[in-house]
Amino acid sequence: MFDIGWSELMVIGVVALIAIGPKELPGVLRMVGQWMGKARKLAGEFQGQFQEAMREAEMADLKKSFDEVKSAATGFTENNVLTSLQKDVDAAMTIDKVQNIDTPPAVPTTPEPPTAETFAEAEAHAMQTTVTEPLAILPPAVAEPAAAEPAVPEPAATTAPVAVDAAADKDAKAS
């Protein structure tokens, strides 16, 4: 606090001893100590109040910045593109629900996957129809007699005998 050295402190002590006297010097020093304690206590209280005011100011600034961030976050969620799109989709869905009540259910546009029964029905239908024209392009001389006689459909050849014949040919070539 005060820039007082040892030599200056000794001079103050000697002057106090001469001015006050040795008899009253301990009481005076005690009173000066009490004043110093009171001064330190007041300085501590002032410093504490000052620091508390600084903390409150910092807290006010912190609260203000927190409120700014909170309002920005609220504004961000209100102006969020996804939120607005979600609101539009929800509105469209409610309109679709109102329209779906009045209209009958739509027929699916994708065909059902074929089953073994549909293949059997198609083969039976093909067997019942007669072929009036030859399936292969033949020269005109051969095509005329075939047209004169009604064609009898031959049963469809299966792939299993062809596979057996191919296996038999391999066995014959190997021997």
Curated annotation (Swiss-Prot):
Highest taxon of source: Bacteria
One of the GO biological process terms: protein transport by the Tat complex
Location within or outside the cell: Cell inner membrane
Ranges of biased composition (kind: Low complexity): 145-166
GO molecular function, one term: protein transmembrane transporter activity
Keyword hit for Transmembrane: yes
UniProt keyword Transmembrane, yes or no: yes
Membrane disposition: Single-pass membrane protein
TM annotation in the entry: 1-21
Keywords, ordered alphabetically: Cell inner membrane, Cell membrane, Membrane, Protein transport, Translocation, Transmembrane, Transmembrane helix, Transport
Role according to the record: Part of the twin-arginine translocation (Tat) system that transports large folded proteins containing a characteristic twin-arginine motif in their signal peptide across membranes. Together with TatC, TatB is part of a receptor directly interacting with Tat signal peptides. TatB may form an oligomeric binding site that transiently accommodates folded Tat precursor proteins before their translocation.
Family: Belongs to the TatB family.
Record PANTHER family: SEC-INDEPENDENT PROTEIN TRANSLOCASE PROTEIN TATA, CHLOROPLASTIC
Subunit relationships: The Tat system comprises two distinct complexes: a TatABC complex, containing multiple copies of TatA, TatB and TatC subunits, and a separate TatA complex, containing only TatA subunits. Substrates initially bind to the TatABC complex, which probably triggers association of the separate TatA complex to form the active translocon.
Protein name: Sec-independent protein translocase protein TatB
The organism of origin for this protein: Rhodopseudomonas palustris (strain BisA53)
